Regions:
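ATP-dependent NMP and nucleoside kinases share a basic, alpha-helical "lid"
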Residues: 89-142
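Conserved nucleotide-sensing/catalytic segment adjacent to the nucleotide-binding pocket
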Residues: 43-105
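P-loop (Walker A) phosphate-binding loop of NTP-binding proteins
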Residues: 24
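Small-molecule kinase domains that catalyze NTP-dependent phosphoryl transfer to phosphate-bearing small molecules
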Residues: 145-191
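Conserved beta-strand scaffold positions in the cores of enzyme catalytic domains, especially
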Residues: 18, 42-44, 122-124, 177-179
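Extreme N-terminal, non-catalytic leader segments
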Residues: 1-19
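Conserved lysine of the Walker
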Residues: 29
Length: 191
């Protein structure tokens, strides 16, 4: 399904076709991205490498500057600093990533209006907000964040408000070429 649809879409960045996978935090975007990357031989750019709790949705200029513009200018590899989410989070400071004919941008706000000139195919993972919150808190509690459950819940309450503002402003679900149900296995939806 995805290969056939992507074959009908032109690159907007020269030779690379970008797939954007959007949805709420905890919706299942990363799962969809990993499945597609394996199927399509694509590299995944994670919005989480740019976003943070302090700047959950307005990090987009960094992606244009460090991802879309270099690829449009013919870059064969990307290199960009990675943000830090948690007190105990010590990721590799820089991401070095090859550019492939298909690239996937995965994360909350991946279908924002500022990215649309670069996106060949948009996917929205539609999952009820309460399910997303439950999944997100559960994930964050197991990630050695250095934070208490109460602190994580407070961050998620703020996060949902930021997502609501973005969703109302940019309406990513309406822009998506494909909407998948984040509560069902992707393979079941492709049959």
């Amino acid at each position: 399904m995805f290969q056939e649809l992507l074959a009908t879409k032109e690159s907007k960045t020269g030779t690379v076709r970008f797939i954007a996978i959007d949805g709420r935090g905890g919706s299942g975007k990363s799962t969809v991205a990993k499945l597609l990357a394996g199927e399509l031989g694509a590299e995944i750019i994670q919005a989480d490498d740019f976003a943070s709790w302090e700047n959950p949705t307005d990090w987009w200029p960094l992606v244009i500057e460090r991802v879309f513009q270099p690829i449009t200018n013919g870059a064969s590899e990307l290199s960009y600093p990675r943000s830090k989410w948690w007190p105990n989070h010590h990721p590799e400071p820089v991401v070095d990533q090859p550019v492939t004919p298909i690239m996937i941008l995965e994360g909350v706000t991946a279908l924002r209006k500022e990215f649309r000139p670069y996106i060949s195919l948009g996917i929205y993972v539609d999952t009820p907000t309460d399910t997303c919150i439950r999944r997100g808190i559960g994930r964050d509690l197991t990630n050695n964040t250095g934070m208490t459950k109460k602190e994580i819940i407070k961050l998620w309450e703020k996060w949902v408000l930021e997502e609501d503002v973005y969703t109302h402003r940019d309406n990513p679900k309406a822009y998506a070429d494909i909407v998948v149900d984040g509560t069902r296995p992707l393979q079941d939806q492709l049959a």
